[in-house]
């Protein structure tokens, strides 16, 4: 009986053996690959949104102008407020949603880019409060992980020596 218990505890058989094997396989995934995938996963929704805000080089789309002027409201303490300077906010959001994700994918200034996208996520949360569980919470978690861990070895930060904490 002692041998069967010992085999289960060391991953020798059954479900615990399968779990032990799976853990070993997952441990082979390099941290740098995980951080690269995390950077891409956070960048994609912002980049897609940013592309929709432009009609040409530094020319906001009619849709972006409309939603920032007419539809988007900040929900703060139970009240709704119009965006201050809506066209400026649309322009800055559009720039941020293009520049920051590109930096993130390249791994250039990863912590800065992730912090910027975290700030944008907070503003988006105030604008679309019902999106917190499906979108904003995962975005915030990914951004915080990248702020803490940086871009990893597969990043421009690593090449130029900005990954001091890695």
What does each model-found stretch correspond to?
Residues 1-63, 76-99, 103-166:
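Extended, low-polarity transmembrane helix blocks
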Residues 69-74:
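Transmembrane alpha-helices and adjacent helix-loop boundaries
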């Amino acid at each position: 009986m002692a041998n069967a218990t010992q085999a289960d505890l060391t991953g020798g058989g059954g479900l615990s053996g399968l779990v032990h094997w799976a853990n070993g396989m997952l441990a082979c995934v390099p941290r740098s690959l995980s951080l690269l995938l995390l950077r891409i996963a956070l960048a994609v929704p912002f980049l897609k949104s940013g592309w929709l805000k432009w009609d040409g080089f530094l020319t906001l789309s009619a849709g972006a102008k409309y939603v920032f002027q007419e539809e988007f409201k900040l929900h703060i303490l139970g009240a709704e407020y119009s965006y201050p300077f809506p066209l400026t906010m649309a322009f800055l959001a559009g720039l941020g949603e293009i520049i920051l994700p590109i930096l993130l994918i390249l791994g250039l200034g990863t912590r800065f880019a992730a912090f910027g996208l975290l700030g944008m996520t907070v503003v988006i949360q105030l604008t679309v409060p019902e999106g917190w569980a499906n979108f904003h919470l995962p975005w915030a978690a990914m951004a915080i992980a990248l702020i803490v861990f940086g871009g990893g070895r597969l990043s421009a930060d690593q090449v130029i020596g900005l990954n001091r904490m890695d």
